């Protein structure tokens, strides 16, 4: 099956090295502010795309159930260790380009620090849209190529690519920045309505993070975030969107579909087998594995 390349964090200590020991307390606090502003107060079933080790999951307290999805099984193992085996959580190892769900399952979704790994962002977003109920809330974060730093670097001739054209820029392999206009077009083409835009991490500079307390800097950022409805010049942008109202809602109790052929699957752990194409998907250690091409050496 032809698919865009997938960025895998399998075996990575990303949660520890980047978030816990990497000096990212400011960025984490900024994201917490944004989520508090954008999240619905309540919901039934949230899909967290690119959930990683579950850093943001406790912030989704308004939802009764949360499905954590990540390509990396080891990241999900860390999330399960952090969050436990509550019936509220379901852990799914899968590829966003081939989501293992029937149409219209979720009434909410988030994709934070994940789209920037998508070589085919419109295809990934189309898969998300397909999984959402009509009018579902979808919070999308993306890395903004038209930020102040990249604009200054471009005018000073310290970078070759323009922050003003709408094409994504791959600054290192499988790491992309996107233009706000491109994101708006893709979302509009899929029927999403953009309800609110917040700009985030305006003060992502080592000097400022050393000079000012995290809480103060994040509070300033939360004020600057309100300018997002007029302009987007920060390195990170959050959108609250709603899916189209004329979509499909899944039948009661239906959730899984074969990512290889789309046939509905019965939830029958420890193994889910597709009656149409005979693909089999194991459930081990509390994690459903729907990856069509898992990393070598990973069961």
Region annotations inferred by a language model:
Residues 122-137:
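A short glycine-rich, Lys/Arg-flanked "PGG" loop and its adjoining helix->strand segment in the class I
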Residues 1-42, 55, 75, 139-162, 291-299:
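Conserved class I S-adenosyl-L-methionine
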Residues 47, 51-98:
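Class I SAM-dependent methyltransferase SAM/SAH-binding core
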Residues 97-109:
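A short acidic, Gly/Pro-enriched loop at the edge of an enzyme's catalytic core
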Residues 108-120:
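A short SAM/SAH-binding and catalytic strip from SAM-dependent methyltransferases
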Residues 157-160, 185, 196-268:
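A C-terminal cap/extension of S-adenosyl-L-methionine-dependent methyltransferases
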Residues 161-182:
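Acceptor-substrate binding/catalytic loop of class I
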């Amino acid at each position: 099956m032809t698919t865009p390349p997938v960025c895998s964090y399998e075996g990575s200590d990303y949660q520890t090295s980047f978030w816990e020991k990497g000096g990212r307390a400011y960025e984490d606090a900024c994201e917490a502010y944004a989520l508090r502003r954008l999240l619905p107060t309540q919901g039934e079933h949230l899909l967290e795309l690119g959930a990683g080790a579950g850093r943001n999951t406790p912030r989704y307290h308004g939802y009764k159930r949360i499905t954590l999805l990540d390509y990396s099984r080891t990241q999900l193992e860390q999330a399960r260790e952090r969050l436990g085996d509550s019936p509220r959580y379901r852990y799914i190892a899968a590829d966003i380009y081939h989501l293992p769900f029937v149409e219209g399952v979720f009434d909410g979704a988030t994709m934070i620090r994940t789209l920037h790994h998508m070589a085919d962002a419109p295809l990934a977003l189309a898969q998300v849209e397909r999984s959402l109920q009509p009018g579902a809330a979808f919070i999308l974060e993306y890395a903004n190529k038209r930020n102040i730093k990249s604009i200054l670097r471009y005018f000073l001739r310290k970078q070759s690519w323009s922050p003003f054209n709408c094409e994504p820029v791959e600054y290192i392999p499988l790491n992309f920045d996107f233009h706000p206009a491109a994101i708006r077009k893709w979302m509009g083409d899929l029927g999403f309505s953009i309800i609110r835009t917040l700009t985030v991490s305006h003060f992502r500079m080592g000097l400022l993070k050393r000079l000012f307390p995290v809480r103060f800097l994040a509070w300033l950022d939360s004020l600057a975030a309100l300018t997002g409805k007029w302009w987007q010049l920060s390195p990170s942008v959050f959108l609250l969107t709603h899916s189209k109202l004329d979509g499909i809602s899944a039948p009661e109790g239906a959730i899984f579909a074969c990512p290889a052929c789309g046939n509905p699957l019965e939830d029958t752990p420890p193994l889910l087998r597709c009656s149409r194409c005979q693909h089999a998907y194991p459930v081990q250690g509390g994690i459903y594995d729907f990856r069509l091409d898992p990393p070598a050496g990973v069961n």
